[in-house]
């Protein structure tokens, strides 16, 4: 049986820990160890990842050293197979482009940001061109429905399968009924992080125009680190539109249970990034019956529509009545059947790893 090596090629602790926890706690108990146990991880602080006793972790201090180790393994054994989780490592793309890593050796789970081309500088534009070619030189991809469609517009010949990120969710919360307080101003969550792709200032202006200054807005901006200048820019813009009591900017990482309590109190989410991202937050909002606004350029709307979930689009006419109707529609959906919810996504992972390991055709 082929040993499948999982590659977390960029030091993104939050997402990497989610994947490792899922493999350690769930997949390692269900699938052969050759498909689930072996990981190569870029982690400057390997100890901070936490204990994962069911996994064999080979940690490297940065993206470059990890990529060199992956390339060495790929060249030493052309039967060796790798599963790239996300892929934010330029050296690995260049290795695929040059043939140091062969297409048949790699399966890639697209995380969204690694597929899209949002930066505008000429250096990024040149890299995007090379990366786009390299992204067609993999054996198979896995992604959301929307990202599969986006990817296959460029690389129609590469096999692609539906697979969802293993969002951290408590299935016990899926069936609960959350009553929304219809009295008083709405509470709106803006963005899923402090990343500029959330277009926070534009979102705040749109919310002010659509719902007025009396709504309460919450902006979780504890990630990424070293983002103080942008946070202050957003805060200043927000205070020009909303009172200090109605503007809450979260500048620290929030504990998971505390984050759930924040989401539970929301009436609407506002996410206008022009790509697929933030599925974890979207899933948690759906659990609590909270609809959200998405950009039409975010292909995840196709996954939502496939699951018969209400979709509100940025740029459409919105008011409180529209939001309350979306809440009503969301409350009527059988959330236990949503494909990208835990535990429904687990079977997809079982199929994906069999394909990636070459144990299924």
From Swiss-Prot:
- Coiled-coil regions listed in the entry: none
What's its EC? 2.4.1.325
One Pfam family this chain carries?
Answer: Glyco_transf_56
Superkingdom of this protein's organism: Bacteria
Q: Please verify whether the record's keywords include Cell membrane.
A: yes
- GO molecular function annotations of the record: 4-acetamido-4,6-dideoxy-D-galactose transferase activity; fucosyltransferase activity
EC top class, as a word: transferase
**Compartments where located:** Cell inner membrane
InterPro entries, per this entry?
Answer: WecF
User: What keywords are assigned to this protein?
Assistant: Cell inner membrane, Cell membrane, Glycosyltransferase, Membrane, Transferase
Cite the annotated pathway. Answer: Bacterial outer membrane biogenesis; enterobacterial common antigen biosynthesis
> According to its record, how does it sit in the membrane?
Peripheral membrane protein
Gene Ontology terms: biological process = enterobacterial common antigen biosynthetic process; fucosylation
The record's catalysed reaction(s) read:
beta-D-ManNAcA-(1->4)-alpha-D-GlcNAc-di-trans,octa-cis-undecaprenyl diphosphate + dTDP-4-acetamido-4,6-dideoxy-alpha-D-galactose = alpha-D-FucNAc4-(1->4)-beta-D-ManNAcA-(1->4)-D-GlcNAc-undecaprenyl diphosphate + dTDP + H(+)
* Cellular-component GO terms for this entry: plasma membrane
Q: Which family does it belong to?
A: Belongs to the glycosyltransferase 56 family.
Describe its function: Catalyzes the synthesis of Und-PP-GlcNAc-ManNAcA-Fuc4NAc (Lipid III), the third lipid-linked intermediate involved in ECA synthesis.
Q: Which NCBIfam families match?
A: PRK02797.1-2
For this entry, the protein name equals TDP-N-acetylfucosamine:lipid II N-acetylfucosaminyltransferase
Please report the organism this UniProt entry assigns to the protein: Serratia proteamaculans (strain 568)
Organism lineage: Bacteria, Pseudomonadati, Pseudomonadota, Gammaproteobacteria, Enterobacterales
Name the gene that codes for it.
Answer: wecF
